[in-house]
Curated annotation (Swiss-Prot):
<keyword id="KW-0479">Metal-binding</keyword>
<comment type="similarity">
    <text>Belongs to the ferrochelatase family.</text>
</comment>
<dbReference type="InterPro" id="IPR033659">
    <property type="entry name" value="Ferrochelatase_N"/>
</dbReference>
<keyword id="KW-0350">Heme biosynthesis</keyword>
<keyword id="KW-0627">Porphyrin biosynthesis</keyword>
<feature type="binding site">
    <location>
        <position position="270"/>
    </location>
    <ligand>
        <name>Fe cation</name>
    </ligand>
</feature>
<feature type="binding site">
    <location>
        <position position="190"/>
    </location>
    <ligand>
        <name>Fe cation</name>
    </ligand>
</feature>
<keyword id="KW-0963">Cytoplasm</keyword>
<keyword id="KW-0408">Iron</keyword>
<comment type="pathway">
    <text>Porphyrin-containing compound metabolism; protoheme biosynthesis; protoheme from protoporphyrin-IX: step 1/1.</text>
</comment>
<dbReference type="GO" id="GO:0006783">
    <property type="term" value="P:heme biosynthetic process"/>
</dbReference>
<comment type="function">
    <text>Catalyzes the ferrous insertion into protoporphyrin IX.</text>
</comment>
<protein>
    <recommendedName>
        <fullName>Ferrochelatase</fullName>
        <ecNumber>4.98.1.1</ecNumber>
    </recommendedName>
</protein>
<keyword id="KW-0456">Lyase</keyword>
<dbReference type="GO" id="GO:0046872">
    <property type="term" value="F:metal ion binding"/>
</dbReference>
<dbReference type="InterPro" id="IPR019772">
    <property type="entry name" value="Ferrochelatase_AS"/>
</dbReference>
<dbReference type="Pfam" id="PF00762">
    <property type="entry name" value="Ferrochelatase"/>
</dbReference>
Amino acid sequence: MKKRIAIVLFNLGGPKNLESVKPFLFNLFYDKAIINLPNPFRYIIAKIISTTRERKSQKIYSLIGGKSSLLQETEEQKLALTEKLKQLIKEDFAIFINMRYSAPFAKEVIDQIKKYNPSEIILLPLYPQFSSTTTGSSVKNFLQNFDIDISIKTICCYPQEEDFIKSHVSLIKEKLYDDDKNFRILFSAHGLPEKIIKAGDPYSFQIKETVKAIVKELNIKDLDYKITYQSRVGPIEWLKPNTEDEIELAGKLKKDIIIVPISFVSEHVETLVELDIEYKLIADKYEVQYTRIPTLGTNKIFINSLTNILLQFINKVDTNLVTSSSSTRICPNEFTKCLCKLTN
């Protein structure tokens, strides 16, 4: 009997207009994976943050058309992935998008899946590196709303997948300065509070694994590069070094800067405003060249990567499987928040 497969793409979500900025912020900060407090405290804090940050965030989104581009970009990735899979598999399939903090929410997507009536479901996060705050939160939220007895296969991460790495390398090579060896590559990832990592989250470990693989594939002798973290907010300790600080340092050294958004596969406010506008101003102050590598988007090699991962999971007979794209747990056992089973 031919399989009928529902594929669910997970992503963050974003406001579709300036009026939806506040509810988006509330949903984000009401997530227990983001603010780990019981109610009513988490609710109150989410209300306060979303209210106090609304106007500032609206001004930021007004710089990029008054909405998040991530919504449209995810639709384009869905279409590209659909076309690629149609060429390669005979099974019936449909791809659904589930955003975590804006529509389409899990309940709505699950209703659509029920109507489709699949024989199995594959969950594919558009977060290459796992974190309990991104993939972990999305998977948990989906499963909490899910009430059908059906096989679910979960792809937890793909930080070292061959074509994922090659897609980054191809975009970096397009922008490398042929006549300039005096540059520094900053691999900029979304930041997280240190306490989340100390609690067993493998995110920074997987970021390092991605960068290690990219640097190896680039094969540039004595490459000057650093891993940095952006979007730091509040007084608590965040992952270091901070992207802004490292741009400042490179500028003082008169090094040209190449920024690679290493944890983002879609353009959104953190790339289009933080990287392209705010951080570029720092480089401009020191009169050094500043080049930002695009996110992977619908890059053909990246779509090949997602396709390869899905084909691998479609062909697996295991039911209710949770593993990385390499079919093994890649995180050391100290990272207790990893979704994969512990290794012996």
